[in-house]
């Protein structure tokens, strides 16, 4: 057995609210690295106001003036990974890499900040993403959650240092760098 069973009081996941609720107040903007709210125009902000918590945007429920793109004048597409409002009581879905592909904040009419998305990916607040905003979105979206990497590394170290049995190792493991 290489893991500990969770205690009965432990949730199997952390909710969005547990992870980012303390970042919603405007006084936190600029206090943390990469925590500046996106500058959406009034039409986009109003469009976000029609998205229910935990739901994607339903174009059919939008007023006519919000059904067309403010820059293109063409009908708005429903990109479910972009026009999706997080649910405070549930875990976040996968953060999709790409420009402006971050989901909508659960209570505010804006997309997540880079810091909020990074917190969901379990990056420590001290970690700074650099470059243009599009690159920062890509860095967060392409990242493997830090806590998963840490847990895997901890388990591998335990197995290799304490419980490695060369006789039971697979052929692949014997050909790897773990066995000399």
Which residue ranges define each predicted feature?
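C-terminal target-recognition/interaction regions appended to catalytic cores
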Residues: 26, 30-180
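Flexible, glycine-/basic-rich loop-and-beta segments that form/coincide
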Residues: 1-34
